[in-house]
């Protein structure tokens, strides 16, 4: 059924298709229909970051930036749902067109630029949702906030979402906000992590609960840079790392229509690059920090490969767009079939 739906949706512009899909998934969630249409995946419980997940396959941030369809996505069988990226103030993002499909490569290029309705609107949607499962909220900085003041934006968002999130993801790796990726390195990263960790401690006392913090990183790093990031995350007391965001590389899409568009590339071409980052992280972290893997999962076996590489959880984005809800169950089944450690 999804194959037919995809054929119809792909006749529309990518952003129109995205918005319509979000509306349909949201409506299905409100009516309780999504769970009837999709066969529920097996229960494969896993405990990560002190949280109990019904299965290790989640929705990656970016598909539901404003929390418009939380219940709908949950009913499709995701073990957890991550919404955002959200910023302190609403912002329109980059000019359209800003999403491009590359179906020959099962890939997407986007330069959305953190378009969202702001953290207050997102929280209104979270409070209206019935979902009681694991909810991640992904936070970023506004486009017009100088990079040297980015920590202020992250703290504003953290303060607001803390009481409503199961975990919070700090996005320092989108390629579509100028200067953002510089926050992944050196003193900039150290200062950001220290500020976040201190605020997390303060908020834990205020709210009587500790909400884990995850940092989402880019795939466009050397092994040495990845190791330094891993060490910084451990030293600062972060709770998880999400690997990875989209890539600036165009390997795998050379010569394709839209292959030279600016923005971040996701989908099948980023798979090996992202999985390599997971392996480097796993070797360095040695179990001290869990890894959430995202990037290029278009078949169930790819999810299992991420777990085998050292991840504890996986997330879907582009693969979900190309393959539909069936990919959730296929990924859960493939992970469940892995030999037990």
Swiss-Prot record:
Q: Tell me what organism the protein belongs to.
A: Pseudomonas fluorescens (strain SBW25)
Q: Which gene encodes it?
A: pyrD
Q: What is its EC number?
A: 1.3.5.2
Q: Where does substrate bind?
A: 65, 110-114, 171, 176, 245-246
The topology of this chain with respect to the membrane is: Peripheral membrane protein
Question: What PANTHER family does this protein's entry cite?
Answer: DIHYDROOROTATE DEHYDROGENASE (QUINONE), MITOCHONDRIAL, DIHYDROOROTATE DEHYDROGENASE (QUINONE), MITOCHONDRIAL-RELATED
Lineage of this protein's species?
Answer: Bacteria, Pseudomonadati, Pseudomonadota, Gammaproteobacteria, Pseudomonadales
Reported function: Catalyzes the conversion of dihydroorotate to orotate with quinone as electron acceptor.
Q: Which residues form a coiled coil?
A: none
Q: How is the cofactor bound?
A: Binds 1 FMN per subunit.
Tell me its cofactors. Answer: FMN
Annotated GO molecular function terms are: dihydroorotate dehydrogenase (quinone) activity
Q: Which GO terms describe its cellular component?
A: cytoplasm; plasma membrane
Q: Does the keyword Cell membrane apply?
A: yes
Please give the family membership noted in the entry: Belongs to the dihydroorotate dehydrogenase family. Type 2 subfamily.
Mind telling me what this protein is named? Dihydroorotate dehydrogenase (quinone)
Keywords, in A-Z order: Cell membrane, Flavoprotein, FMN, Membrane, Oxidoreductase, Pyrimidine biosynthesis
Active site, renumbered:
174 (nucleophile)
- Report the catalytic activity: (S)-dihydroorotate + a quinone = orotate + a quinol
According to its UniProt record, where is this protein located?
Answer: Cell membrane
Principal subcellular localization: membrane
NCBIfam families membership: PRK05286.1-1 (NF003644), PRK05286.1-2 (NF003645), PRK05286.1-4 (NF003646), PRK05286.2-5 (NF003652), pyrD_sub2 (TIGR01036)
CDD domains noted in UniProt: DHOD_2_like
- List the pathway annotation: Pyrimidine metabolism; UMP biosynthesis via de novo pathway; orotate from (S)-dihydroorotate (quinone route): step 1/1
> Which processes are annotated in GO (biological process)?
'de novo' pyrimidine nucleobase biosynthetic process; 'de novo' UMP biosynthetic process
Q: Which Pfam families match?
A: DHO_dh
**Top EC category:** oxidoreductase
Provide the assembly information.
Monomer.
InterPro entries, alphabetically? Aldolase_TIM, DHO_dehydrogenase, Dihydroorotate_DH_1_2, Dihydroorotate_DH_2, Dihydroorotate_DH_cat, Dihydroorotate_DH_CS
């Amino acid at each position: 059924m999804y194959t037919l739906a995809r054929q119809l949706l792909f006749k529309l512009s990518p952003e129109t298709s995205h918005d319509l899909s979000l509306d349909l998934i949201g409506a299905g969630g409100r009516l309780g229909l999504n769970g009837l249409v999709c066969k529920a995946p097996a229960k494969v419980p896993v405990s990560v970051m002190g949280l109990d997940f019904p299965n290790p396959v989640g929705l990656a941030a970016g598909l539901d930036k404003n929390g418009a369809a939380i219940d709908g996505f949950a009913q499709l069988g995701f073990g957890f749902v991550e919404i955002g990226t959200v910023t302190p103030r609403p912002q329109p993002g980059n000019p359209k067109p800003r999403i491009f499909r590359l179906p020959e490569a099962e890939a997407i290029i986007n330069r959305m630029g953190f378009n969202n309705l702001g953290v207050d609107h997102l929280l209104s949607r979270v409070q209206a949702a019935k979902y009681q499962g694991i909810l991640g909220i992904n936070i970023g900085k506004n486009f017009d906030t100088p990079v040297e003041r980015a920590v202020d934006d992250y703290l504003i968002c953290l303060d607001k979402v803390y009481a409503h999130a199961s975990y919070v993801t700090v996005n320092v790796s989108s390629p579509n906000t100028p200067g953002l990726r510089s926050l992944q390195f050196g003193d900039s990263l150290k200062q950001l992590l220290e500020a976040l960790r201190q605020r997390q401690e303060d908020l834990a006392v205020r709210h009587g609960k500790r909400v884990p913090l995850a940092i989402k990183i880019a795939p466009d790093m050397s092994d040495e840079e990845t190791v330094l990031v891993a060490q910084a995350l451990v030293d600062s007391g972060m709770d998880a790392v999400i690997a990875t965001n989209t890539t600036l590389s165009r390997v795998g899409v050379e010569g394709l229509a839209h292959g030279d568009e600016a923005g971040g590339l996701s989908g099948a071409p980023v798979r090996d690059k992202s999985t390599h980052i997971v392996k480097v992280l796993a070797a360095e972290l040695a179990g001290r920090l869990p890894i959430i893997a995202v990037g290029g999962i278009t078949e169930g076996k790819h999810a299992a490969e991420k777990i085998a590489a050292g991840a504890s959880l996986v997330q879907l984005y582009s693969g979900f767009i190309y393959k539909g809800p069936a990919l959730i169950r296929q990924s859960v089944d493939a992970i469940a079939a892995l030999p037990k450690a």
